[in-house]
Amino acid sequence: MKSCDMRIEGRIVRVRSTEQSVGIINMKELRGGTIMIAEKMKPFVQNNSAIRMMFEEGNRLRAKYGADKVYDFSLGNPSVPAPDCVREAIIDLVNNEEPTVLHGYMNNAGFEDVRETIAQSLNRRFGTAFSAHNLIMTVGAASGLNVILKTILNPDEEVIVFAPYFLEYGAYVRNYDGKLVEISPNTETFQPNLKELEEKINANTRAVIVNTPHNPTGVVYSEETIKELAAILEKKQEEFGSVIYLISDEPYRELAYDGVEVPYLTKYYKNTVVGYSYSKSLSLPGERIGYLVIPDELEDSSTVITAAAIANRVLGSVNAPSLMQKVIQKCVDAEVDVAAYDRNRLALYNGLKECGFECIKPQGAFYLFVKSPVADEKQFCEAGKKYNILMVPGSSFSCPGYVRLAYCVSYDTIQNSLPEFKKLAAEFGLN
């Protein structure tokens, strides 16, 4: 643990930091109001991400016991290296492209030739009819979601999400003074609870966010589910005389198993915006590169496209990283070795089932969502630490009673963890 002094509003404040966190501000001082940060930021500081905190706990345990004796399933950080074409593309571009072009500004939407290459790839794969103007290159999917929410959301309008969900969605919606509305989980299948959705959509609903393949459950929404969802949204648009956007967050699209197909949502509902990231499909999470798709069929699409490009700029991104845009152009149809994740998926799923744990077999992404053997899943997570097993509580995804395990780890980590999971299961009367 390192420490440093920060000057905040004329005061010197001691801040502790690790490699993974830039600082932990004293909570007593924060509550007392002596640190002058925005009111909107105080809840984020007070409730720092459980996932990140668990990752830091993993660092502590690794330092104490050794990396091979710690089973850290907390963070969805890809463990499979990027395809060779990524390295080759970077070398080729740096050696052969004009530097002022390669590293320079471009249209806020991104290089036109890059966007056209991606559009044609999507058209080949999904039978769509996109062109360059339908795409906006973004600083990953997270930035893309902020861009589209900035573009469409007015203060106090509602955005609906299906629990369990990535909790940062709430932060993104509140960035633009919107209101997040949760739909309770369908814990039998973890397909969206469409009955409750239909009840909660109202005249103030601006958008619905979906994520498939799904974090944290690994479920892929079926075509039947997507068709039913689209029908509900169409009906509600007509009922309220307003546009309801469907925002599809797709960082895990390429990670699907057992031949499962992931429906491409613009084909089912015209007012769909797709947010994509190469963080998982090419193992490039730190490079922050992705895109938005805004189809021509979307209501007033040309205005939305123009506004989204401007939002990309005014939110501070200006444009997506220029070098990585060109890398993506050269690697547009490449993907990571999904077979490695599949091997991990089967080993961990089968191993946990043999220990007596309950969970749905994931169809995509790289997560298992396991039912806690006790009502308070945080108690279960704490018990896991005794065996150097790190899991994320389901309450971090607005779904208490479950824990998430990210199996984007080494195969040896999974194999070595299973005897410890067996001990953990025995502690709770399983097996």
Regions found by a protein language model. Name each.
Residues 101-102:
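Pre-Walker A segment
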